[in-house]
Amino acid sequence: MGNCLHRAELSPSTENSSQLDFEDVWNSSYGVNDSFPDGDYDANLEAAAPCHSCNLLDDSALPFFILTSVLGILASSTVLFMLFRPLFRWQLCPGWPVLAQLAVGSALFSIVVPILAPGLGSTRSSALCSLGYCVWYGSAFAQALLLGCHASLGHRLGAGQVPGLTLGLTVGIWGVAALLTLPVTLASGASGGLCTLIYSTELKALQATHTVACLAIFVLLPLGLFGAKGLKKALGMGPGPWMSILWAWFIFWWPHGVVLGLDFLVRSKLLLLSTCLARQALDLLLNLAEALAILHCVATPLLLALFCHQATRTLLPSLPLPEGWSSHLDTLGSKS
């Protein structure tokens, strides 16, 4: 948000010369004893002073980025191993191919977190930053769309239920996610050694498109799922979308979509913040929402593990075992 994002540092010589010039003009124009009260003088200086905000995710936040990345990679890798482990009960989890893609998306996000982290040097290129933002938002968009499909289609996503459905959804969802990342990929780069979104008049259309995409995927999609669930239940039209613990994923990205929309309105001057405190509060919310979104790469594998544990414990007694599982259990029974 303008100078609320980046504080302009003045050299001592510049500060001294500015102070001397101001004092000379003030004294020569009005004299030492002025008719204005001290309160008005201080208020005028405060109003004319630039509004500065402290960035929470600066170089001091590097340990947070690194720790989150490492934990996210380890947790996602563990979940993927359990999902693809032969003859393991998580493969009976409804829609497990979609769940595996969620873990892949979380792992991809965890990998690019250090690329966008501040404090790792000042030699990063714009191409690397654009690639980082592409994977960052692409994996998040794909995870949100996968959750929507998993909630809407439910048990029909199981292996062998509808031939080609899982493959078609995989290609379609990741393709749509890649298209949605084009605006942020083109509107991002390196500035002062940091990966950042570039705000300019020429890129305003790309910024608006990216903001709309975030609002649609992170805000409107979960609201639509909740609305459809409540409407179908109220009208007695069926169970509606399959509600599960996985819906907690949107808690990590919903604030990011909302605050990003507010920030775009302020930058476009469609929403005016008259006080410095309000602008500082918005900057703080942007940092907190980004930090919460980053934490999703650690929370997603935990949500997947909890969902698979609950689903297999509930559905395992009633599900028909695949042929390989039956022979495996028979072998174990004969040995005992």
Swiss-Prot record:
Mind telling me which residue stretches traverse the membrane in this protein?
A: 64-84, 96-116, 130-153, 167-187, 208-228, 245-265, 288-308
Q: Which residues are glycosylated?
A: N16, N27, N33
Which biological process annotations from GO are given for this protein? chemokine-mediated signaling pathway; inflammatory response; regulation of chemokine production
| Cytoplasmic compartment segments | 85-95, 154-166, 229-244, 309-336
Q: List the disulfide bonds.
A: C51-C276, C129-C195
Amino-acid biosynthesis as a keyword of this entry, yes or no, is no
Keyword entries, A-Z: Disulfide bond, Endosome, G-protein coupled receptor, Glycoprotein, Membrane, Receptor, Transducer, Transmembrane, Transmembrane helix
Q: Where in the cell is it found?
A: Early endosome; Recycling endosome; Membrane
- Provide GO CC annotations from the record: early endosome; membrane; recycling endosome
List the InterPro entries hit by this protein, alphabetically: Duffy_chemokine_rcpt
The protein's job, in short, is: Atypical chemokine receptor that controls chemokine levels and localization via high-affinity chemokine binding that is uncoupled from classic ligand-driven signal transduction cascades, resulting instead in chemokine sequestration, degradation, or transcytosis. Also known as interceptor (internalizing receptor) or chemokine-scavenging receptor or chemokine decoy receptor. Has a promiscuous chemokine-binding profile, interacting with inflammatory chemokines of both the CXC and the CC subfamilies but not with homeostatic chemokines.
Family named by the database record:
Belongs to the G-protein coupled receptor 1 family. Atypical chemokine receptor subfamily.
Identify this protein by name. Atypical chemokine receptor 1
Q: Could you tell me which species this protein originates from?
A: Pan troglodytes
**Gene that encodes it:** ACKR1
